[in-house]
């Protein structure tokens, strides 16, 4: 019988998963396979991106010190995926989106394993399972300066959404109130405490308006507004093409057709291994159960964790 794996961190959102890395990787790879199956059945386009793309080219699989899988999806396909998920049963998998759950603090979607439990941040407690990140890829302005301005506008909305989604302690509220420079944040968080759901809907509508400003099919440039690489998230749509397949563990996955231009744009010499001290897992994990789904109420009953 396989030993149960339940891990928790009482003070921070950092959790070492080295001892369970093999099982972790196998689980997220299975999630990717399920996602690929959905895309094949509905003729949806996606590309592996970021560290996952480097992993495919340099390691032919998950980077040994990486701990997630990321894909980008053209906006028309992404919007179709959101609709498909509402009417289709994916068995042990589910699509988690910011439109369906007020407790979900992010602004892109994840395909998640219902048979596992993961809380990434105690400040923004949301129960999901192990996952693959799905980032929408939006058309943007042909002029790169205007594309930057749009990125800045979008980021401001993201920052407001982050503020609304973060749960502060009473002491933290008092600290904000005591500092006149923080009164603006105090006002936002107080309003969010009472009106979180309508404020979230309004912010998401603002983000969607920016995302749909341009016709994807006619666009010269595309942009991952929800990505974490700043202005590098804008690049020529022509780089994507029909995709180029690479071995990734025991499957093949698509990368942008001009994958070398794409990866050098983001990472420079991506074939060069980073220094040893930078080969670390970077994602948040406050609570993890690899064996079953728990509710937030169940997790809070554990005496040694406060979420």
Feature map (PLM): residue ranges:
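Accessible peptide chain termini
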Residues: 1-2, 15
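Active-site nucleotide-donor binding segment shared across nucleotidyl transfer reactions
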Residues: 36-69, 73, 78-79, 238, ...
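A short secondary-structure junction signal
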Residues: 143-149
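Short, His- and charge-rich active-site/binding loops that engage polyanionic ligands
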Residues: 151-155
